């Protein structure tokens, strides 16, 4: 299957280094708000890449649940494959892609577990069925069939008909950024790339060649 004729010309926006915020968190928050306002499909979806003990990379999509001055927060099963990778090597890479805006954001940094009480607080806001699912799913483990998963979920629901506590193996990670790159598509593949990199306690902002 040949795909070399599938291409778009990027013409919608410009990213000026002069107009960027002094720190990447503020710049990201601005772009995130614009993605939500533009009704981008899944504006909080991000790819997270990790490396296992053999040095082999793997990636998957997760949802961003919070941005604060420290970094980017997502939640998962700590016993999942991604959790095991992070336990072995906490350095991860995040990528957001908003095609409707011809934009991409790449983040590299260290993932650290957030305090249990913060995970408890978020877990309590999840729909009941999602909380049941956190108990029923041994994420990344091989299962015999889908019916067995539903059966386990039913057992959990019977045990917790009202309040579902957070499993100890489920919680949040904070990705503390070391570099953040904002990419804006431009004509002729001469794209805008503005990178922020942490140096001591300061953010250095620089333009990269596309």
From Swiss-Prot:
Chain sites annotated for binding FMN: 60-65, 75-76, 81-82, 104, 139-140, 183, 193
Positions bound to substrate: 7-10, 65, 122, 126, 130, 189-191
Details of cofactor binding: Binds 1 FMN per subunit.
Single GO term (MF): FMN binding
Broadest EC class assigned to this enzyme: oxidoreductase
Keyword Transmembrane helix: no
SUPFAM superfamilies reported in the protein's UniProt record: FMN-binding split barrel (SSF50475)
Reaction(s) catalysed (UniProt annotation): pyridoxamine 5'-phosphate + O2 + H2O = pyridoxal 5'-phosphate + H2O2 + NH4(+); pyridoxine 5'-phosphate + O2 = pyridoxal 5'-phosphate + H2O2
EC numbers for this chain: 1.4.3.5
Coiled coil: none
Named cofactor requirement(s): FMN
Alphabetically ordered keywords of this record: Flavoprotein, FMN, Oxidoreductase, Pyridoxine biosynthesis
Quaternary data: Homodimer.
Family the UniProt entry places it in: Belongs to the pyridoxamine 5'-phosphate oxidase family.
Family annotation (PANTHER family): PYRIDOXINE-5'-PHOSPHATE OXIDASE, PYRIDOXINE-5-PHOSPHATE OXIDASE
Role noted for this protein: Catalyzes the oxidation of either pyridoxine 5'-phosphate (PNP) or pyridoxamine 5'-phosphate (PMP) into pyridoxal 5'-phosphate (PLP).
Protein name per its UniProtKB record: Pyridoxine/pyridoxamine 5'-phosphate oxidase
Gene name linked to the record: pdxH
